């Protein structure tokens, strides 16, 4: 089994203006992997560039991959996968996931997952809170469709997922 070392900016030199790069070099000598929850995604990228161990994005303003993985695993747990093995790469292939809510970090990550795993996302966001496709980083609009009406976005969906309607 493993152990967890939980550090906040108050528990480390990160809160005392030590460069992220230096913290990455030191911390990664003591652990097998690092998970970071922070606001700016660039902080994770900088840490990872100087780390000796894998770095997991626990949450940033731009992305929330751990939550999307948890949602996908919950889908597999309740609905199974196409081949009955629980294979992550096939579980949503050809399916439709409806996203209703703010075009935030979770919406961005659902779009990335759709492109990687071969499903379609139906997006319904409030006006002024749309997904910024340059942040989401999707290469093609083939993996998503945008709907003004949330009910239309959810019609025929295999999975409906949501978050706040508008972030504060």
Regions found by a protein language model. Give the residues of each.
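Glycine-rich phosphate/diphosphate-binding loop of Rossmann-like nucleotide-binding domains
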Residues: 1, 78-162
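Short glycine-rich anion-binding loops that position phosphate/pyrophosphate groups of nucleotides
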Residues: 40-41, 164-168
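Surface-exposed loop/turn and secondary-structure junction residues enriched for glycine/proline
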Residues: 15-17, 23, 71-72, 109, ...
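Phosphate/diphosphate ligand-binding glycine-rich loop within oxidoreductases
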Residues: 1-76
């Amino acid at each position: 089994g493993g152990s967890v070392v939980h550090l906040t900016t108050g528990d480390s030199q990160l809160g005392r203006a030590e460069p992220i790069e230096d913290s990455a070099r030191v911390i990664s000598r003591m652990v097998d992997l690092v998970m970071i929850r922070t606001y700016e995604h660039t902080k994770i990228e900088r840490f990872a560039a100087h780390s000796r161990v894998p770095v997991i994005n626990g949450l940033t303003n731009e992305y929330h991959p751990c939550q999307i993985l948890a949602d996908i695993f919950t889908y597999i747990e309740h609905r199974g996968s196409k081949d009955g093995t629980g294979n992550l790469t096939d579980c949503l292939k050809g399916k439709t996931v409806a996203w209703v809510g703010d075009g935030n970090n979770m919406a961005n990550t659902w779009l990335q997952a759709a492109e990687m795993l071969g499903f379609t996302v139906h997006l319904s966001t409030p006006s002024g809170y749309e997904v910024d496709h340059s942040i989401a980083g999707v290469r093609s609009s083939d993996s998503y469709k945008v709907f003004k009406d949330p009910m239309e976005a959810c019609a025929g969906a295999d999975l409906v997922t949501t978050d706040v309607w508008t972030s504060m």
